[in-house]
Amino acid sequence: MGARVIDGRPIAGELKKRVASEVEGLAARGVRPGLATVLVGEDYAARAYERRVGGLAAELGCRYVCERLPREAEEADVLAVVGKLNADPRVSGILVLRPLPGHISEPAVFSALDPLKDIEAVHPVNAGLLALGRPRYVPSTPAACFYLLDRYLERSGRPPEEFYPRSTVVVVGRSNNVGKPAVSLGFARGAAVISCDANAYRAGRLREHTLKADALIVAAGVAGLIDESYVREGVIAVDVGINPVADPGGSGRTLLVGDLDFGSVARKAEALTPVPGGVGPITDVWLLKNTVAAGRGLAFRARSGGERGAPGISGGYGGQ
């Protein structure tokens, strides 16, 4: 029996209905969540993502604005835009699109965000809360990985809260936006978690780690990095990679492929995600889910007249 392909689109559709219902509920109380993106330069992937989330925000009934700056903009210009959005009561969530140009400090920009509006948990306070298992917001891509895994497990008759404590989750990639948060989410579910990256590959030890995986999350940004020799029979593999490659058929088109060698891994896996159409659709909706949660929290703060602490939106299993 071949591996099951986990299509993320219907899962994203179900999540989108939940988020839309939350937006309607807030609207009935006079609250309209608002998402703002900050785009510096003309990076193709960042522009494409901005268009997607902007369209989704409009579809769900959220306010949306994109602040665009030229690549030559100074760091002070970006910080000024962030400060303006922090102060705007119509904006509940802010996403600074990456990559930023090399002359602009990501830590400086991320640290300037209002933590209550930092829906990707890049502010040091929010990143720390996530690492402590008390997240204010869970970053959208790692959240999407585990949301997809949880739904797949449930539909195959395995409660996630029973699966993870008996399983090893291996995360390939240690980026601040995917790999490291994914490790924290694995720990929050009670799994044994192994984190590895390019250093393990260069040392010739990546395979010995990935062969231990019951669930494998690959976010290395290397096309076809993981083939069947890196996985054991029955693994559940989640591919976060989005790598543009030339069509091997010679059409001249550019194709998007993941970090898994899909056909090879499918010979041994129980299930795996495609690229595109796996994690990506859920990631987009999760960003708006965080925006709506931020809008709800800011409305509560305005009514109560004070600062609120971290609400623990996704502590343990509750938020996912």
From Swiss-Prot:
E.C. numbers: 1.5.1.5, 3.5.4.9
GO annotation (BP), single: L-histidine biosynthetic process
Record InterPro entries: Aminoacid_DH-like_N_sf (IPR046346), NAD(P)-bd_dom_sf (IPR036291), THF_DH/CycHdrlase (IPR000672), THF_DH/CycHdrlase_cat_dom (IPR020630), THF_DH/CycHdrlase_NAD-bd_dom (IPR020631)
KW RNA-binding (keyword) present: no
Keyword RNA-binding: no
Keywords: Amino-acid biosynthesis, Histidine biosynthesis, Hydrolase, Methionine biosynthesis, Multifunctional enzyme, NADP, One-carbon metabolism, Oxidoreductase, Purine biosynthesis
Binding of NADP(+), residues: G173, R174, S175, I242
Catalysed reactions, semicolon-separated: (6R)-5,10-methylene-5,6,7,8-tetrahydrofolate + NADP(+) = (6R)-5,10-methenyltetrahydrofolate + NADPH; (6R)-5,10-methenyltetrahydrofolate + H2O = (6R)-10-formyltetrahydrofolate + H(+)
Gene3D superfamilies noted in UniProt: Leucine Dehydrogenase, chain A, domain 1, NAD(P)-binding Rossmann-like Domain
Origin superkingdom: Bacteria
Pfam family, one: THF_DHG_CYH
Pathway membership, UniProt: One-carbon metabolism; tetrahydrofolate interconversion
Any single Gene Ontology cellular-component annotation: cytosol
MF terms (GO), sorted A to Z: methenyltetrahydrofolate cyclohydrolase activity; methylenetetrahydrofolate dehydrogenase (NADP+) activity
Family as reported in the entry's similarity comment: Belongs to the tetrahydrofolate dehydrogenase/cyclohydrolase family.
Subunit description: Homodimer.
Main function: Catalyzes the oxidation of 5,10-methylenetetrahydrofolate to 5,10-methenyltetrahydrofolate and then the hydrolysis of 5,10-methenyltetrahydrofolate to 10-formyltetrahydrofolate.
Name the UniProt record assigns to this protein: Bifunctional protein FolD 2
